[in-house]
């Protein structure tokens, strides 16, 4: 092989390696870096918490009939799932509070009690801003980490007393009060600040749970639902062809979301 051919071969191999490496680096960046998307619609409501100040994004409804807290995946608020869900729910008549799990985890250490305090504060701020009654119905929804944290809050006796149910999109079987680098890379949360949803499930009473299951999602878990107490209604909502992000909260997902809320309204909390 001539020198010129060797040079061409080396350069060709280098280009191939770069082409293969680029999507891997992009994927790692996508996992590790928080999303910096800022909604053009939401108003930020300040929260004063024992763990430090924070804020919830408020999406107004013309004639609000209840409150929906939308909790993010571990990457933070994005136009991928959270923003479409918040906008859809506001149009449907819910005063929405957006909860950025990544920002919360990046700015403090916390446990279940502090997480419950924070969710309660978000509900109270949205209730006040929307002018809703103290006994208005409340729902939590979340994607991945957000769904897991919603379960942790619901398992506490100190949660908001008017919680109707949880709309959980793609939770895993374990989570953490926080977000570690290992979590972002897909490792199963372990250690003293982690928790299993199945361990919390027996404490969940008086609400309903709808879990959305993407057909192509390798990360979610449904086994934890079997640990719920007798009388805590739950249902699985299959989303055909959907990966972990539920297909970006498209029309099919949002339609199922609406039907899940109606199911909760039609279903007694204790059977």
Annotated model-derived regions:
Residues 74, 214-218, 240-243:
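Acidic beta-to-alpha connecting loop that harbors the catalytic carboxylate
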Residues 232-271:
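C-terminal catalytic histidine-bearing segment of alpha/beta-hydrolase fold enzymes
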Residues 129-131, 135-195:
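Primarily recognizes the serine-hydrolase "nucleophile elbow" in alpha/beta-hydrolase
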Residues 26-63:
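N-terminal cap/lid segment of alpha/beta-hydrolase-fold proteins
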Residues 109-132:
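Alpha/beta-hydrolase active-site loop
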Residues 176-230:
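The feature captures the conserved acid-bearing segment of alpha/beta-hydrolase catalytic domains
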Residues 2-24:
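N-terminal Sec-pathway targeting helices
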Residues 61-91, 98-101:
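Short, surface-exposed "cap/lid" segments of acyl-processing enzymes
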């Amino acid at each position: 092989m001539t020198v010129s051919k060797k040079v061409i071969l080396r350069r060709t191999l280098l280009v191939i390696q770069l082409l293969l490496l680029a999507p891997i680096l992009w994927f790692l960046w996508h996992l590790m870096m928080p999303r910096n998307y800022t909604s053009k619609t939401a108003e930020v409501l300040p929260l004063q918490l024992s763990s430090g100040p924070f804020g919830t994004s408020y999406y107004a409804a013309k004639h609000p009939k209840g409150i929906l807290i939308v909790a993010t995946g571990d990457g933070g608020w994005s136009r991928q799932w959270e923003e479409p869900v918040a906008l859809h729910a506001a149009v449907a008549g819910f005063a929405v509070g957006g909860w950025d799990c990544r920002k919360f985890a990046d700015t403090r250490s916390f446990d279940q009690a502090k997480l419950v305090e924070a969710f309660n504060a978000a509900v109270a701020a949205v209730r006040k801003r929307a002018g809703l009654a103290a006994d208005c119905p409340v729902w939590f929804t979340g994607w991945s980490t957000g769904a897991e944290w919603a379960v942790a809050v619901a398992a506490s006796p100190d949660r908001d007393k008017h919680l109707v149910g949880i709309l959980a999109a793609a939770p895993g079987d374990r989570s953490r009060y926080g977000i570690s680098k290992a979590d972002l890379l897909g490792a199963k949360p372990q250690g003293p600040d982690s928790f299993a949803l199945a361990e919390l499930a027996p404490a969940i009473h008086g609400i309903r749970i709808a879990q959305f299951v993407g057909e192509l999602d390798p990360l979610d878990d449904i086994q934890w639902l079997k640990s719920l107490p007798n009388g805590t209604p739950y249902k699985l909502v299959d989303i055909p062809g959907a990966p972990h992000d539920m297909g970006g909260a498209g029309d099919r997902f949002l339609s199922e979301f609406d039907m899940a809320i109606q199911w909760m309204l039609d279903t007694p909390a204790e059977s």
